[in-house]
Amino acid sequence: MSISHPDTVLIIDFGSQVTQLIARRVRAMGVYCEIVPFQLALEGVKRLRPQAVILSGSPYSVIDDGSPRAPMEIFEIGVPVLGICYGEQVMCVQLGGKVESGHRREFGRAFLEVQEKSALFDGVWEKGSCYQVWMSHGDHVAALPEGFRVIGTSKGAPYAAIADEKRCLYAVQFHPEVVHTPDGTKLLQNFVHKISGLKGNWSMASYRDQAIATIRKKVGKSRVICGLSGGVDSSVVAVLLHEAIGDQLTCILVDHGLMRKNEAEEVLKLFRDHYNIELIHVNAANIFLNALEGETDPEKKRKTIGRLFIEVFEEETKKIEGVEFLAQGTLYPDVIESVSAIGESVTIKSHHNVGGLPERMNMKLVEPLRELFKDEVRSLGRELGLPEQFLGRHPFPGPGLAIRCPGAVTREKLEIIREADAIYLDEICKAGLYDEIWQAFVVLLPVQTVGVMGDGRTYEFVCALRAVTSVDGMTADFYPYDMEFLSKTAARIINEVRGINRVVYDITSKPPGTIEWE
């Protein structure tokens, strides 16, 4: 589902790990932008008609044979272009300059000395002063193309910032998009607002109105189904669609018996009772738990749950007449990953999604969130009036509690983990910590230990508490609870949950660990 935007920045991705940060910074300015891999850059120009272009960094060396290039047309269409790191080098090489392998590499914090005034530095950096930046390069520009001048230098990069103001071409060897370049966002604002003249009119309010109009045009009078889990993405999709097409929407909640305590009831209460959305609740717990019986391999558990979800969802859909469209909560990072500039990434875990549904069910897709990042989805949810209880929820995996029970999943273990998890989250909320934490949950270990309760000996399970801070889930640190909180939470779990006699806290960061245990 494509929505038109009057002011657009095109970001050409050469495979940098921080390309998405560029997009997030630009969108935070109220300007719409899209990332396209370098192979599709020309198609992106024709489709988006951008008012500015940014060239990303890259793990490649511009000196190597076959390394990525930008289409020459990018420099000839008359819009401002900003090259970042590899983007600077590729701009120079393609326009007649020279890049060499550096004898002095720069990785991490560095200092740039401003040599000349420039529109890029206007109101931020002064000529003759030094400023902290973040570098990550081995090669460096050795000779400038005709028309360029040097505006900033560093110890390892004699052309750390360059400009050809006549053609509105700018480039920097450092990364302005990362927080380690303190003034980086201001420099990007200069490029987007002052140099490119973009106004910053893009907002979630305008996106909501455009999305509703686009949905109505695409769907017409047809019926749409939507898988609803109660998570942020599916909740926002459901409410947005309902606002657009009303009773043409039917939502299906597949209850696989692996949800948290009272979760299904909360979803039904909000969407069926409050929003009056037609919602079919499928209690499929027996189907899922019987299929998972005795299975200990985490990958097989995920695949079994994914396969059964599709089968149950498909069976329910057959009972609804006239369905032509399937709504999905695909987000922009999913879209970016699917057309990666450097190919598919290594599979760490199978992701639980309904991506296999359209092919099997012969339906058209409606993906109203496919242009948004996660934080933007939450903002859209607020525009739609969704309660914070749903919008502020921690991420919850599609396979549910099955991957928080290492080893075989049983009904007894699920009841134990539900109760322990509810207590843990309750204590987090009471302490006012919920919004400080990216994700928090209990893992029930397939280990039993000896304990003493009263005058009796116990032999019960160990549970691990997990809590992490993160920005995007790609990296994470454990949350530094104080001992009083951990002591109080552990005491409640042991005293109130039958089946647990020992509590531990997981202090592993990501990497090397993952956030979930399976």
Swiss-Prot record:
Q: In which pathway does it act?
A: Purine metabolism; GMP biosynthesis; GMP from XMP (L-Gln route): step 1/1
Report the InterPro entries cross-referenced here: Class_I_gatase-like (IPR029062), GATASE (IPR017926), GMP_synth_C (IPR001674), GMP_synth_GATase (IPR004739), GMP_synthase (IPR022955), GMPS_ATP_PPase_dom (IPR025777), NAD/GMP_synthase (IPR022310), Rossmann-like_a/b/a_fold (IPR014729)
Q: Which residues form the GMPS ATP-PPase domain?
A: 202-393
What keywords sit in the KW lines?
Answer: ATP-binding, Glutamine amidotransferase, GMP biosynthesis, Ligase, Nucleotide-binding, Purine biosynthesis
* GO MF: ATP binding; GMP synthase activity
On whether Nucleotide-binding is a keyword of this UniProt record, the answer is: yes
Q: Which PROSITE patterns match?
A: GATASE_TYPE_1, GMPS_ATP_PPASE
Domain (Glutamine amidotransferase type-1) ranges: 8-201
Give any Gene Ontology cellular component.
cytosol
What is catalysed by this protein? XMP + L-glutamine + ATP + H2O = GMP + L-glutamate + AMP + diphosphate + 2 H(+)
EC number(s) given by UniProt: 6.3.5.2
Q: Which residues bind ATP per the record?
A: S229, G230, G231, V232, D233, S234, S235
Q: Which cysteines are joined by disulfide bonds?
A: none
Q: Where is the active site?
A: C85 (nucleophile), H175, E177
The record ties this protein, via Pfam families, to: GATase (PF00117), GMP_synt_C (PF00958), NAD_synthase (PF02540)
* Complexes and interactors: Homodimer.
- HAMAP family, alphabetized: GMP_synthase
Tell me, in a sentence or two, what this protein's role is.
Catalyzes the synthesis of GMP from XMP.
**Name under which the protein is recorded:** GMP synthase [glutamine-hydrolyzing]
Q: Which organism is it from?
A: Bartonella quintana (strain Toulouse)
Q: The organism's lineage? A: Bacteria, Pseudomonadati, Pseudomonadota, Alphaproteobacteria, Hyphomicrobiales
